A protein has these predicted regions:
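Terminal RNA-binding accessory module
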Residues: 344-437
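Short flexible coil/turn linkers enriched for glycine and charged/polar residues
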Residues: 143-146, 156-158, 254, 264, ...
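Proteins enriched for Cys/Gly/acidic motifs involved in redox and nucleic-acid/cofactor modification
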Residues: 1-205, 243, 258, 280-291, ...
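Conserved SAM/AdoMet-binding glycine-rich loop
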Residues: 74-81, 86, 189-311, 322
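Short glycine-enriched, charge-decorated loop/helix-capping segments at active-site entrances
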Residues: 49-50, 169-170, 271-277, 344-349
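Conserved, mostly hydrophobic/aromatic
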Residues: 160, 180, 197, 232, ...
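Thr-Gly-centered strand-to-loop micro-motif
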Residues: 9, 34, 272, 329, ...
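Radical SAM enzyme [4Fe-4S]-AdoMet core and its adjacent flexible, acidic
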Residues: 12, 206-227, 273, 336-367
Length: 437
């Protein structure tokens, strides 16, 4: 055994997938995982910088690790991910106890860099981004035993004015379809029952290499033996096609859940955000989804407090929310990100106004979610058993194909089983029920 490592992951599912590839390299080098900071010989923080709160958490944790390193000077401490890409050497200037800073395009170099630092103790900063690089054949140490994250592409070409992602993840680069399918097959062979295909905008998959588009890839993955559920995220509304909708409709294992971030319900703000669609265009795409996939769940993201937002804009968004009736909406306060066009826009919205509007938005959505779930009372749904509930070990937790959490009494079922559950107590965020035996 070379030593022990601990990795902390902040941010999106893509960061989780990157961290699994980092862990794979460390384990291949002889390191074993520990959850105890004091026992670790290597500590990594895989970071996010989409919102200021994410960066604040990282800086707080960096301060904690400084105290650990004072008692364990041989500890190797590295910062990876989007915040590492954005800040680079600034992180080391601010916190000299950091040994290396590794950008989003250098995940594959982790094993080598850790070995070099262990031997030479020379600090490293590597945040170079190759516009075309897609690394394959990295060892993967997956978390869990049921659901596997499978990146299909990296980067983003959309440049929404509020978003830092294109600057820290680079331009879109798609993996070759045969590489994605091979990874899914390996996951199935390892016992995984569900895969989630990941990308900043999965609907753009394949535009760079032309070998297959996202609908083609979905069909290939749907055919992999042993995989019972196929999910994907995230979709940009401008790129969702009738071909993709038909592929989901005709698939066997493709789940009837589409996350389609609208971000706002006012054309004026959508234009300022550079979302390149209108409310009307989004509405039509959502209509096509619901027409082809009755019973599918539609979820979204919404940002409150974008620069220049007026009460009239916000009222339009509330009206749009009531019209769309999403199963769930992930709501966020606008976070000013230096280097993005929105950060320099006039009429930044005061924090107290942002918070008040967010509360109003969430109240409307909670009411909608509760009403939609109430419509499932007495329905029988297929649930994949994921494990014990966080709050009660006597209760199983699982999800439907439409991505709704279902809680039901612990019986003879095992993790990974697929069971039929009758819904008896619909709630805003979860469904409670009983197994149909």
């Amino acid at each position: 055994m070379r030593g022990r490592y601990k990795i902390l992951v902040y941010g999106c599912q893509m960061n989780v997938a990157d961290a699994e590839r980092m862990e794979g390299q460390l384990q291949a080098a002889g390191y074993v995982r520990t959850e105890k900071t004091a026992d670790a010989d290597v500590i990594l923080i895989n970071t996010c910088c989409v919102r200021e709160t994410a960066e604040d958490k990282v800086y707080g944790k960096i301060g904690e690790i400084k105290k650990v390193k004072e008692h364990h000077p041989q500890l190797i401490f590295g910062i990876t991910g989007c915040m590492a890409q954005k800040e680079g050497e600034n992180l080391m200037r601010r916190a000299p106890h950091i040994d290396f800073v590794l950008g989003t395009g250098k995940v594959q170099e982790l094993g080598r860099i850790v070995a070099e630092i262990a031997a030479e103790r020379a600090p490293v900063v590597d945040v170079a981004l190759d516009a075309h690089a897609v690394e394959e054949d990295l060892p993967i140490a997956r978390g869990g035993t049921l659901s596997a994250w499978v990146p299909i592409m990296y980067g983003c070409n959309n440049y929404c004015t509020y978003c830092i992602v294109p600057y820290v993840r680079g331009r879109e680069r798609s993996r070759m379809p045969e590489e994605v399918v091979a990874e899914v097959r390996r996951a199935a062979a390892d016992g995984y029952r569900e895969v989630t295909l990941l990308g900043q905008n999965v609907n753009s998959y394949g535009k760079d290499h032309g070998q297959a588009d996202f609908a083609d890839l979905l069909r290939m993955v749907d055919a992999v033996e042993g995989i019972r559920r196929v999910r994907f995220m995230t979709s940009h509304p401008k790129d969702i096609s009738d071909k993709l909708i038909d592929t989901i409709k005709n698939g066997t294992h493709i789940c009837e859940h589409i996350h389609l971030p609208v971000q706002y319900g006012s054309n004026r703000i959508l234009k300022a955000m550079n979302r390149v669609y209108t409310v009307e265009q989004y509405r039509e795409r959502a209509r096509r989804v619901r027409e082809a996939l009755p019973g599918a769940s539609l979820t979204t993201d919404l940002i409150v407090g974008f620069p220049g937002e007026t009460e009239e804009d916000f009222a339009e968004t509330l009206d749009f929310l009531r019209e769309m009736r999403y199963d769930a909406a992930y709501t966020f306060l606008y976070s000013k990100r230096s280097g993005t066009p929105a950060a320099a826009m006039a009429a930044q919205v005061p924090d107290e106004v942002k918070h008040a509007r967010l509360e109003r938005l969430m109240a409307v959505q909670n009411e909608i979610s509760r009403a939609i779930n109430e419509g499932l009372r007495s329905a029988q749904v297929e649930v994949m058993v994921e494990g014990a509930s966080k709050n009660d070990p006597a209760v199983w937790s699982g999800r439907t194909r439409t991505n709704k959490i279902v809680l039901f009494p612990h019986g003879a079922e095992r993790v990974g089983d697929f069971v039929q559950v009758k819904i008896t107590q619909p709630q805003t965020w979860v469904l409670k029920g009983e197994v149909v035996r």
